Amino acid sequence: MTEVYDFDRSSWDTKGSLAPILPTTYPDGRLIPQVRVIDPGLGDRKDECFMYIFLLGIIEDNDDLGPPIGRSFGSLPLGVGRTAARPEELLKEATLLDIVVRRTASVKEQLVFYNNTPLHVLTPWRKVLTNGSVFSANQVCNAVNLIPLDTAQRFRVVYMSITRLSDDGCYRIPRGMFDFRCKNALAFNILVTIQVEGDFCSNRGNLSMFKDQQATFMVHIGNFSRKKNQAYSADYCKLKIEKMGLVFALGGIGGTSLHIRCTGKMSKTLNAQLGFKKILCYPLMEINEDLNRMLWRLECKIVRIQAVLQPSVPQEFRIYNDVIISDDQGLFKIL
């Protein structure tokens, strides 16, 4: 049995929205570079120079003989760096980068990025830019099938999204808890409904994910479990959730991210599951990459958040990560 409880609007009203990046052009039709700054935190970190940078741009032919042919809209996550440079300075240098893009494959299709331009204000992000980086193509590219192999490609930066990391302490991305299951436990999930504004019809993707310009995604927080082989009631778990004093915000980690901060009391078991951290970050790039790509530069805001309590999936249930499912005859060999 699934039980659903609504959080009060005050838990996300302050920072539960993201401003759009509205395209503007020069007289010749070229896009004017823009930077967006997001601060999903409470501002209690003493040093405010830490930030996460996410680049958006166009993957196009690297051909000096004529106007470049744009192949697809893409992104390049640079990660966390520390700098006192102004956002405009960071954007200016990013637009001057010579970022080469190459299409390849491993378990999934991938895109390789590396920069050939000397760095100045972007030096804190040299690990990704200078040493090169490889990402899952579906996470960073709208249409990887349109990227050719016989023509050199470059990534031309058009937009920059900066997320200030102003919360005191570190951010926990609880990957290790996603597959944790326990007998007689109740799984605590969060269902987020967002309202999307803007010209999302121009984005490549599955528009059916929006109903009345709204979309939902769910994240797993942890499990409520007792030491003895007994289960908590849903009403008791609701009281525990209310005592946690959860505050929600939207950030720009990996494109769009959900930030959750516990301002109250957390149960010892759940606290241990989360590594004794009370600031959680869920990048939509890892949770729902299709929705994340649709939201890259659109305006979105939280309109509803619900706590979802469900029985934890039994331990005997197997998790299948591929389409082979089960091959008892030994006809498929996984290398």
Curated annotation (Swiss-Prot):
Subcellular location: Virion
Organism taxonomic ancestry: Viruses, Riboviria, Orthornavirae, Negarnaviricota, Haploviricotina
Domain of life: Viruses
GO cellular component: viral envelope
Name of the protein in its database record: Matrix protein
GO molecular function terms attached to this record: structural constituent of virion
Family: Belongs to the morbillivirus/respirovirus/rubulavirus M protein family.
Function according to Swiss-Prot or TrEMBL: The M protein has a crucial role in virus assembly and interacts with the RNP complex as well as with the viral membrane.
InterPro entries named among the record's database cross-references: Matrix_C, Matrix_N, Matrix_Paramyxo_C, Matrix_Paramyxo_N
Keywords for the protein's UniProt record, in alphabetical order: Viral envelope protein, Viral matrix protein, Virion
